[in-house]
């Protein structure tokens, strides 16, 4: 399993290349389509992402692409699964697996990310569809009092549990603890929260025996 994870990491981290986030949810991509007068149907989304992934030379600059679950199951006009369209260009297919955020109970203003239930079984399907890495995003609202320790600990534990499940299934995890930058706090407060959040995340990763060499950290 470690050799599989190492091969994926090396492919994702090709020098001079980056990761493309193409994992917009249906509501998000609907807003973008509406701005250019396009109705957001499943066929329109399939055609758009097919065009994107088949762009000649894309693999010269992009080493991995994060896909939405819908996209992973779609095919190009010639019947080729879109994950394979990406792979043929040397682009590693990945998938966003979290189910979004909700309010954290007994923690006003804080949020927690959902999606751990049944994750291992979902990975079994995603791997057959070509996914080799995954992404999970935790969101931290910032103010003079936020995030609270409960939110930092709960989200860190969820990120670590997700990462451990990923590695157990041969999937490289992208761990994304996003400290939001749209509040009215100053940069010093943002730095303070970021340090605390990353500390909690890496303590949790260690508790869950996540191999750091086989994961990617995506900070804000």
Task: State what each model feature region is.
Residues 119-204:
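Helix-rich catalytic cores of soluble enzyme domains
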Residues 38, 50-60, 164, 168, ...:
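Generic secondary-structure signature for well-ordered alpha-helical cores
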Residues 92, 172, 214-216:
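Proline-centered loop/turn at the N-terminus of a beta-strand
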Residues 208-220:
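Catalytic alpha/beta core domains of metabolic enzymes, predominantly
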Residues 102, 192-193, 217:
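Domain-level signal for soluble alpha/beta catalytic cores
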Residues 1-129, 142:
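Alpha/beta catalytic barrel-like cores
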Residues 20, 41, 136, 175, ...:
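Conserved, mostly hydrophobic/aromatic
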């Amino acid at each position: 399993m470690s050799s599989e994870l190492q091969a994926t990491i090396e492919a994702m981290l090709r020098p001079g290349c980056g990761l493309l986030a193409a994992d917009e949810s249906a509501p998000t991509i609907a807003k973008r389509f509406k701005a250019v007068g396009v109705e957001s149907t499943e066929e329109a989304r399939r055609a758009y992402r097919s065009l994107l992934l088949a762009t000649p030379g894309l693999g010269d600059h992009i080493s991995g692409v994060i896909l939405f679950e819908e996209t992973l199951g779609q095919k190009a006009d010639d019947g080729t699964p879109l994950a394979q369209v990406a792979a043929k260009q040397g682009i590693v297919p990945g998938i966003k697996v979290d189910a979004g955020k909700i309010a954290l109970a007994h923690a006003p203003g804080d949020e927690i990310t959902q999606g751990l239930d049944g994750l291992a079984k979902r990975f079994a399907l995603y791997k057959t569809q070509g996914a080799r890495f995954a992404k999970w995003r935790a969101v931290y609202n910032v103010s003079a009092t936020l995030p609270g320790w409960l939110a930092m600990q709960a989200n860190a534990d969820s990120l670590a549990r997700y990462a451990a499940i990923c590695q157990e299934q041969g999937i490289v995890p992208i761990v994304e603890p996003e400290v939001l930058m749209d509040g009215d706090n100053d940069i010093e407060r943002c730095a303070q929260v970021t340090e605390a959040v990353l500390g909690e995340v890496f303590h949790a990763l260690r508790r869950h025996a996540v191999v750091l060499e086989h994961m990617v950290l995506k900070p804000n």
